[in-house]
């Protein structure tokens, strides 16, 4: 068909306004779409705008800009540090509060490792930490990465001279530009210090003691008979009966402190209560754990090894959340050691895990301690990995410290690029001396002065599970979503219907399969590396 046949028969049949309106409509829609795109882009950009005040040039006392210093080359480095967290508001830079990072940054500037032109902005130096510690928490080893001037061979010594005694730099190592100490940290070692008297069974007459003894009568043979704890409390009772009359002991045990405005420190009964508690504390500090009880505690902590669902060992995690599954690589419980003027016996618990959730370590220590002191079967810990919610109390924060981050996987890449591996074990002697002087001694002293662990476990033993902390009667509810009390969990009866965590949990199986694949891959990598490092035999040499 020709073009002439396609044209309309009459010119008046063509309405030019229609074409104009159509073109205008298309143009309007296109402009509106472009405008909407610009609005969306602006919204996205607003989300990423750094609204914090920007740092300007350095000024002198009169407000005039200071001259810039000559620029020296900066290198990406990993700085290995240790610190006592007492008196600091955590690790992370948080002005105007004193933090570990603010003290380190100030020392870097004063030592010349960071130019004064960059002394008012951490971001200019790419400051990053491997593990963030909270207020008052210590670290024998932690790591920060940043860009630093390291031309001076004595830079480490100069930085340490500018730092307070409670913060030390162990070493400074060059790393490649892509190094991110937080993301490339493959695992972490934590340490928890626990006085052994924490493993003594509940005090006779306490609520938890009565619940345990009643459950033993109903279901004999489930819980251990803790003869060691019975002997301890009998010795204390005998000593107390020699120093106080029966009437005085009854009055002491029934004593309720008055309101603060009515409190009288010189009151005769209060003074007797004070002496009674001092006598009990003296017996606790003289306590020495038996080999059998220490073995029970070690068996309890070993239940955490491997991949498990730790949703009950943190806050705000549901059983079905994949992030609740964590992998514990190793747990070591030391032999008991006596330290300090009070001659208290302690044990050290070291936990090596890929990653940890909020309060996880404190709840793990608390659960293992309660299982041991109440005589429960150690296998009961595996029930806490199941769907049922259980309220596990947190052990005191006092004993917790970061031992060191581990960069096992990334160290291989560093060595390939010609850099030294990040390894805290090279400085173990220095770290141990520092921990003993600036961390352990402070923990021991605070425990003696405040009786932190005694207060915690005394509260657990006397806690009323019916009225709770608010004095309101709790409703009797059932179902896995309803949080159950730890006190039901610790008796011979346990929580009705609660069984070991199901082995068929998909996420746990997937994680275990991943662990096996990772181990096989590492083995193959080591094997191939060994073979590649063997000198090749040249044909000439072979012929000779």
UniProtKB/Swiss-Prot annotation:
Record keywords: Isomerase, mRNA processing, Nucleus, tRNA processing, Zinc
GO biological process: mRNA processing; mRNA pseudouridine synthesis; snRNA pseudouridine synthesis; tRNA modification; tRNA pseudouridine synthesis
Principal place of residence: nucleus
Disordered, as annotated region: 1-74, 495-544
Annotated compartments: Nucleus
Catalytic activity: a uridine in tRNA = a pseudouridine in tRNA; uridine in snRNA = pseudouridine in snRNA; a uridine in mRNA = a pseudouridine in mRNA
Cofactor: Zn(2+)
Domain of life: Eukaryota
Molecular function, one GO term: mRNA binding
Record's cofactor remark: Binds 1 zinc ion per subunit.
GO cellular component: nucleoplasm; nucleus
EC id: 5.4.99.-
Broad enzyme group: isomerase
Alphabetized Pfam families for the sequence: PseudoU_synth_1 (PF01416)
InterPro entries according to UniProt: PsdUridine_synth_cat_dom_sf, PsdUridine_synth_TruA, PsdUridine_synth_TruA_a/b_dom, PsdUridine_synth_TruA_C, PUS1/PUS2-like, TruA/RsuA/RluB/E/F_N
Start-end of Basic and acidic residues biased regions: 1-10, 31-61, 513-525
Catalytic machinery residues: 134
Role description: Formation of pseudouridine at positions 27 and 28 in the anticodon stem and loop of transfer RNAs; at positions 34 and 36 of intron-containing precursor tRNA(Ile) and at position 35 in the intron-containing tRNA(Tyr). Catalyzes pseudouridylation at position 44 in U2 snRNA. Also catalyzes pseudouridylation of mRNAs.
Protein family according to the UniProt entry: Belongs to the tRNA pseudouridine synthase TruA family.
Misc. remarks from the entry: Present with 8130 molecules/cell in log phase SD medium.
Protein name, as recorded: tRNA pseudouridine synthase 1
Annotated gene: PUS1
């Amino acid at each position: 068909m020709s073009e002439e046949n396609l044209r309309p028969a009459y010119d008046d049949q063509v309405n030019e306004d229609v074409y104009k309106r159509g073109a205008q409509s298309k143009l309007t829609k296109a402009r509106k779409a472009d405008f909407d795109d610009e609005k969306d882009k602006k919204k996205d950009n607003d989300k990423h705008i750094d609204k914090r005040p920007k740092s300007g040039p350095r000024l002198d006392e009169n407000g005039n800009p200071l001259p810039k210093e000559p620029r020296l080359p900066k290198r990406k480095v990993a700085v290995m540090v240790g610190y006592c967290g007492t008196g600091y508001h955590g690790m992370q830079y948080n002005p105007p509060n004193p933090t570990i990072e603010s003290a380190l940054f100030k020392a870097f500037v004063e030592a010349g490792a960071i130019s004064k032109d960059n002394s008012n902005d951490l971001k200019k130096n790419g400051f990053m930490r491997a593990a963030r510690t909270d207020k008052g928490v210590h670290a024998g080893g932690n790591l920060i990465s940043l860009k630093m001037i390291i031309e001076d061979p004595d830079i480490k010594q100069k930085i340490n001279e500018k730092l307070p005694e409670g913060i030390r730099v162990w070493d400074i190592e060059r790393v490649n530009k892509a190094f991110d100490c937080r993301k490339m940290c493959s695992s972490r070692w934590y340490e928890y210090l626990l006085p052994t008297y924490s493993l003594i069974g509940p005090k006779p007459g306490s609520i938890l003691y009565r619940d345990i003894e009643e459950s033993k009568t109903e279901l004999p043979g489930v819980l251990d008979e803790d003869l060691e704890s019975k002997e301890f409390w009998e010795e204390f009772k005998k000593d107390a009966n020699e120093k106080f009359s029966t009437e005085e002991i009854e009055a002491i045990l029934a004593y309720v402190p008055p309101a603060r405005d009515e409190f009288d420190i010189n009151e005769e009964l209060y003074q007797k209560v004070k002496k009674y508690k001092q006598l009990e504390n003296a017996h606790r500090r003289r306590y020495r754990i038996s080999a059998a009880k220490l073995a029970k505690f070690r068996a309890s902590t070993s239940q955490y090894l491997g991949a498990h669902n730790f949703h009950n060992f943190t806050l705000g995690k549901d059983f079905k959340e994949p992030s609740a599954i964590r992998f514990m690589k190793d747990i070591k419980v030391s032999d008991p050691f006596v330290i300090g003027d009070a001659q208290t016996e302690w044990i050290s618990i070291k936990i090596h895990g890929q990653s940890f959730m909020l309060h996880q370590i404190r709840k793990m220590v608390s659960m293992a301690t309660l299982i041991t002191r109440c005589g429960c079967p150690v296998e009961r810990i595996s029930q806490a990995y199941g769907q049922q919610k259980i309220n596990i109390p947190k052990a005191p924060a006092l004993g917790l410290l970061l031992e060191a981050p581990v960069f096992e996987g990334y160290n291989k890449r560093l060595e390939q690029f010609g850099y030294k591996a990040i390894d805290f074990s090279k400085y173990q002697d220095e770290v141990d001396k520092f921990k003993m002087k600036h961390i352990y001694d402070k923990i021991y002293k605070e425990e003696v002065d405040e009786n932190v662990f005694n207060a915690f476990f005394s509260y657990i033993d006397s806690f009323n599970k019916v009225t709770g902390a608010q004095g309101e009667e709790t409703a009797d509810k059932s179902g896995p979503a309803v949080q159950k009390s730890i006190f039901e969990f610790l008796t011979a009866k346990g929580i009705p219907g609660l069984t070991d965590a199901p082995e068929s949990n998909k996420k746990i199986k997937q994680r275990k399969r991943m662990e096996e694949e990772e181990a096989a891959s590492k083995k193959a990598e080591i094997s191939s590396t060994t073979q590649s490092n063997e000198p090749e035999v040249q044909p000439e040499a072979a012929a000779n």
